[in-house]
Amino acid sequence: MHKTRLALSCLLGSLLLSGAVHAAEALVPPKGYYAPVDIRKGEAPACPVVPEPFTGELVFRSKYEGSDAARSTLNEEAEKAFRTKTAPITQIERGVSRMVMRYMEKGRAGDLECTLAWLDAWAEDGALLTTEYNHTGKSMRKWALGSLAGAYLRLKFSSSQPLAAYPEQARRIESWFAKVGDQVIKDWSDLPLKRINNHSYWAAWAVMAAGVATNRRPLFDWAVEQFHIAAGQVDSNGFLPNELKRRQRALAYHNYSLPPLMMVAAFALANGVDLRGDNDGALGRLAGNVLAGVEKPEPFAERAGDEDQDMEDLETDAKFSWLEPYCALYSCSPALRERKAEMGPFKNFRLGGDVTRIFDPAEKSPRSTVGKRD
């Protein structure tokens, strides 16, 4: 009996130690984020004025204002008002993405310093942290977090260690990312299943990027949990019921759901969590259904209860940036890889910039100019 108790005690101690070691492991991104900075001759462009940190209420008009339940009819007046009011947020999203891409490709210190100056200014002013918001406002918050933290990850983890000379700025920026991430979690937690759609998936990507950038495991865990919920929504045929509600835009919104889900899955796998088996392979099933739908949209039209599907969004190659993490997660066919190469390189500022350089660095073409497709 004594020996049995001793053995159990040793086993328990071993398990506890193992758990402690696992808990202490630093969060990491996929290996493409460790790429060194390319160094070239020349000076960086002058640093533009920092966009005014957005510290006001995140209350904006929706571009679908006045639309029916499908939320698919554009209100041009509301969209104009939305774009005007959110201009500083979009400016920093696109600007940081562009500067980080340019820095990683050319290694000019001015681009790095300008990026950090922009992010630090927003961090010091506590931008995007208001608790006064509407649905469109909290949507902008999570999109911005994903864009900024996603781009910052390339600086944080590059083997060239570009942030080593800027510890104070990095500390303030990461502290801000963590605070915004905490608020995004509050914004998008505990929703009824009928209201969980692509917005929640993008929130999961934003929180995942912030969690890895700041090494906050509660953020990582929340993002993984949102993925579990998303995977559970995918039916046996690869459809998302809440995206079918978009009627003529159902296929486009299924496609729009894939970038954040693929990124969360790729980051989870980098940290030893394989989400590809969730709900009997839901992520792969969703991707396969979307790819089939692009070629033959009739099943989407039938399930969405609309004669036609709006294919305009799907004519833009950048909408398929999710193919990069997809082909890193799955064994893509030669035909799909060739198609991906023809459509890329992919740049998506909402995913942190140059997705192709992160997931398929060997796929470089003359088309890979800085700023293209973002």
UniProtKB/Swiss-Prot annotation:
Q: Where is the signal peptide?
A: 1-23
GO CC field: periplasmic space
Molecular function via GO: poly(beta-D-mannuronate) lyase activity
Q: Which domain of life is it from?
A: Bacteria
Please give the biological process terms from Gene Ontology that the record holds: alginic acid catabolic process
Main EC class the enzyme belongs to: lyase
Where on this chain does substrate bind? 62-63, 135-136, 253
What does the free-text pH dependence field read?
Optimum pH is 8.1-8.4.
> Is the Signal keyword given for this protein?
yes
Q: Where in the cell is it found?
A: Periplasm
Q: What is its main location?
A: periplasm
Recorded catalytic reaction(s): these are: Eliminative cleavage of alginate to give oligosaccharides with 4-deoxy-alpha-L-erythro-hex-4-enuronosyl groups at their non-reducing ends and beta-D-mannuronate at their reducing end
| Keyword Nucleotide-binding belongs to the record | no
Q: What is its EC number?
A: 4.2.2.3
Xref: InterPro entries: Alginate_lyase (IPR022859), Alginate_lyase_dom (IPR008397), Chondroitin_lyas (IPR008929)
Annotated family: Belongs to the polysaccharide lyase 5 family.
| Purpose | Catalyzes the depolymerization of alginate by cleaving the beta-1,4 glycosidic bond between two adjacent sugar residues via a beta-elimination mechanism. Splits ManA-ManA and ManA-GulA bonds, but not GulA-ManA or GulA-GulA bonds. Also cleaves acetylated residues. May serve to degrade mislocalized alginate that is trapped in the periplasmic space.
Provide the protein name: Alginate lyase
Provenance organism? Azotobacter vinelandii
